[in-house]
Swiss-Prot record:
SMART domains: Enolase_C, Enolase_N. Binds a second Mg(2+) ion via substrate during catalysis. The active site is at 205 (proton donor), 340 (proton acceptor). Keywords: Cytoplasm, Glycolysis, Lyase, Magnesium, Metal-binding, Secreted. Its main location: cytoplasm. PANTHER family: ENOLASE. It comes from Aster yellows witches'-broom phytoplasma (strain AYWB). It is found in: Cytoplasm; Secreted; Cell surface. Catalyzes the reversible conversion of 2-phosphoglycerate (2-PG) into phosphoenolpyruvate (PEP). It is essential for the degradation of carbohydrates via glycolysis. This is Enolase. Belongs to the enolase family. It is an enzyme of class 4 (lyase). Its cofactor is Mg(2+). The gene is eno.
Amino acid sequence: MPYIESILAREVLDSRGNPTVEVEVYTESGAFGKAIVPSGASTGQHESVELRDCDAKRFLGKGVLQAVKNVTEVIQPELEGYSVLEQTLIDKLLIKVDGTPNKSNLGANAILGVSLACAKAAANYLNLEFYQYVGGVWPKQMPVPMMNVINGGAHASNSVDFQEFMILPIGAPSFKEALRYGAEVFHHLGKILKQKGLPTTVGDEGGYAPDLNSNEEALQIILEAIKSAGYEPGKDIFLGMDVAASEFYDKKIQKYVLASENNKSFSSKELVHYYETLVAKYPIISIEDGLDENDWDGWKYLTQKLGNQIQLVGDDLFVTNTQKLAKGIENKIGNSILIKLNQIGTLTETLETIEMAKKASYTAVISHRSGETEDTTIADLAVATNSGQIKTGSCSRTDRIAKYNQLLRIEDQLVEAPFLGLKTFYNLKK
């Protein structure tokens, strides 16, 4: 039987060269599971706590030796002898042992690593792919890739306020073709930037990070790349933005200050009207974190104005948390949630959040973090849950490409899994 025999953990590096936690779970049956935990750059105030050592002599204080120690010295003794097939029980026990509402005792990075490694050991024991184990008979849909081709904000050192400008190859007939559409646009965008004398260095998530005059210029140059690649904006490929508005919200004056707009300040309503102008002008189908995570009144107004037209994704707003999401659903705020495993800290809680979103007709976007690794868990999770969308960066950096390549493998295995394209956005009315 797949009873837990030992749990190992180590400090490894993520795509930014910062330490993170890798966990290996071994069972008496010989079944084995391994997981590496990602890390974010722009993090919501209400996320589960990522435990760091704060020892300035190691990794500028970002070491995770205490989290590793918590896995081997605290968690392992508690889980020894449990079957990895009891995922819900394991995750509840992890939460109980931690004993805090935000996992600040053991660290969400320690807890998530164990949670995922146990699930992967269970899949290994049953000789199933991870998406098959998590999704059972349900996996039947390939996700639309939300490809971050221009990085700004906290993900790049440039003059662009908004954190991500994405392309969504919604008009493609399959995931494989959608990936091709995106890759071709990415390369055309690189050529255009070079022609304009702009740098083609990339940000944390593999997108270009040029110094542009405004956020709108980013949209314009992406449209140029789409057309240059031979695709039609608004038909073959749509646009999306992760504004990450909390990053430029000034709490003192309670305004949103856009550096690229000559430090012009916007009230919540003024920023919503700015978005309305962009949506009317460009084929934008998704805006993430359009307002500060605590600006619930502003979010309410944003949803009233644009909620029927485009996808309004809550990341920092909901932090993959059922309590936060329930509040949003009750108040009709947003219509989509970004799903990040390490925001909540266990596989079970993540699946519960996705289920809650679906029951309320909110879409769920499975997402990476800016600090990623070769771990491809989120690719399997997107298919297992039929989320229909995945956000895992651009067409560069192996830590991003690893997820896309895993999805290509899964698409081959599922053979007839549909790519629903525009139908993925089932809750939009206009």
